[in-house]
Amino acid sequence: TSGGIDSSSVVMSALDVGKEVRVYSFTFGKHFSSDFEAARKLAWEFNLTFVPVFLPSDRDEIVETVKHLIKNVGCKKKTAIECLFPFYYLIKLMKEFKDETLVTGVAADGHFGLSKKAMIHYSKDDQKFKKFRQDYFSNLESAGTKRLIKLCELNKIQLCNPYFEPSVFSLWIDKNWEELNKPRQKEVIRMHYPELDFLKIKPHTNLQLGDSKIAETVGNAVISKYKPNSKSPIGIYNRIAKGVYA
């Protein structure tokens, strides 16, 4: 969990139906991001086992994992690589604990139109906002969902991704942006989980961005390995996919 409302709500829902829950969250070394701290706080509050997933800082290990995600999992886009990177290590740790099911809040953002693009182009127009969500949830590539499914399949882990389910989509597709996000972002979720108000949940941030350092650490590793003067890792990812960088 990131300690945000999406992943925290699935924790609470799992507890509500009597499941045994172990909370995982990732971090680079002792750089504890706000997401990591919030996840730890959530586990503490509800007396759940908390498992820190320590991501590697070694350049060559990061690069080899990126290659695996591109070649074997099928990640093509920069965001998919960066988002799947921590899940690779999380799933490895799950297998050590013999946990069989991964429950995530992945793709929840698609219901709410909180990206910069969605806020500018869709939030004020109900029909455009509806089409944006229909397009988003008709494409398994959204939020790296298809690649996360593949990563779990390769590791024989069952994936439960409730926010991508049609039953959840149908709950909110006829609501406009303000009905979903006022008075707080993702209000239609938050109102049902008042027990999570103590987390003081921050506004939307992509998993790999913010203070997690995932995007910059992964990107800098491949740049350092293959093209030190490059300003972006995108070209390097493409060359790995084409086999230029074996």
Segment roles from a protein language model:
Residues 102, 107-127, 139-230:
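Mid-to-C-terminal catalytic subdomains of enzymes
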Residues 77-83:
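Short, flexible loop segments at the rims of nucleotide/cofactor-binding pockets, characterized by
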Residues 94-99:
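Glycine-rich phosphate-binding loop signature in dinucleotide/nucleotide-binding domains
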Residues 1-46:
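ATP-dependent adenylation/pyrophosphate-handling site
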Residues 10-14, 42, 86-90, 189-192:
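Structural preference for long, well-ordered alpha-helical segments in enzyme cores
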Residues 228-246:
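Acidic, carboxylate-rich catalytic segments that either coordinate divalent cations
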Residues 1, 22-27, 52-54, 103-106, ...:
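Short beta-strand segments
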Residues 36-73, 104-106, 111:
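A conserved beta-strand->alpha-helix junction
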